[in-house]
């Protein structure tokens, strides 16, 4: 039947589709195979035919063209393929392959292969994190990319305890994901943080514009909601007011106005 035009893809926009490029181990790779395919290296001491292969590198090949992501550790299993593959096509017509492998501690490595100009090159490896959104208890996992101009990836920060945050990314000139926004939404973090003493903060309006300084008393609940992951953390108080904590030292121990964050707050959660 007919399809409503509003649901048809924009021919001038880029897109991302799931793909299923064949995979084989280096032991069985047919050197005469001219099709596009992946070849994985394994640590023979870690091979487990029931649970999969512990891979140590991944190569994308086509004929005599190839590129390898070295020292990429992931499990490949025929029944449960932990390697997700996406073909990324930008609005300029450039094409890339994103090979996404679950790594350690809920991290994902996105291996970016450039397949333009009848060649294969490794642009790099982008590391992101699974996202758990506490506003939706049923949501946990990876964002699935569908739009080169709107890809959302999780990152881990440590400016206010440990937290997971995510933000919009776009495909860069070399195919690598690049941050498009300067602020990330915090999806999981120290939800029970309370001030141990009076704290000077910057008040914000509902558009996150700074409105002036104010002192918040001890015992106030601070819910972290946004951050730039470098200089501030925005929080919501129980009465709905929005405040900004300005970070003056980013390495541990993190400081706000020259005081250690652990001396200012209780209930901060740390992971890793």
Question: What do these predicted regions represent?
Answer:
Residues 1-19, 23-26, 136-272:
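Acidic, small-residue rich beta-repeat scaffolds with periodic aromatic anchors
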Residues 1-81:
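Terminal domain-start segments
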Residues 14-50, 92-105, 111, 141-164:
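Short beta-strand elements that form the blades of beta-propeller/WD-repeat-like
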Residues 29-33, 43-50, 63-70, 79-80, ...:
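Exposed regions on extracellular, virion, or secretory-pathway luminal proteins
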Residues 37-39, 66-78, 125-127, 181-190, ...:
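Short amphipathic beta-strand/extended segments with alternating polar/hydrophobic composition
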Residues 54-76, 111-129, 167-182:
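Surface-exposed loop/turn elements that mediate protein-protein interactions on large endomembrane-trafficking
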Residues 78-88, 127-146:
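Repeated scaffold domains used in trafficking and secretory/extracellular systems
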Residues 85-129:
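Long, charged/polar, surface-exposed segments that mediate recognition or autoinhibition
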């Amino acid at each position: 039947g007919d399809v409503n035009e509003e649901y048809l893809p924009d021919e001038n926009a880029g897109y991302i589709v799931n793909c299923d490029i064949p995979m084989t181990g280096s032991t069985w790779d047919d050197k005469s195979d001219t099709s596009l395919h992946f070849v994985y290296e394994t640590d023979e001491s870690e091979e487990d035919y029931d649970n999969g292969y512990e891979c140590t590198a991944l190569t994308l090949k086509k004929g005599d063209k190839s590129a390898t992501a070295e020292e990429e550790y992931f499990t490949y299993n025929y029944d449960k393929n932990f390697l997700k593959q996406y073909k990324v096509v930008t609005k300029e017509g450039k094409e890339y392959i994103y090979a996404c492998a679950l790594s350690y501690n809920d991290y994902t490595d996105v291996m970016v292969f450039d397949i333009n100009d009848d060649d294969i090159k490794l642009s790099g490896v982008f590391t992101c994190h699974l996202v758990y959104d506490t506003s939706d208890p049923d949501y946990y996992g990876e964002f699935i990319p569908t739009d080169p101009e709107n890809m959302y990836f999780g990152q881990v920060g440590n400016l206010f305890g440990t937290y997971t945050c995510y933000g919009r990314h776009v495909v860069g000139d070399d195919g690598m994901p690049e941050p498009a926004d300067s602020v990330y939404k915090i999806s999981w973090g120290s939800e029970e943080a309370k001030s141990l003493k009076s704290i000077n903060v910057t008040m914000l309006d509902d558009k996150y514009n700074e409105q002036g300084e104010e002192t918040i008393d001890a015992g106030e609940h601070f819910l972290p909601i946004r951050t730039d992951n470098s200089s501030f953390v925005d929080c919501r108080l129980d009465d709905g007011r929005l405040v900004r904590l300005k970070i003056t030292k980013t390495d541990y121990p993190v400081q706000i106005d020259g005081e250690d964050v652990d001396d200012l707050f209780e209930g901060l959660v740390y992971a890793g």
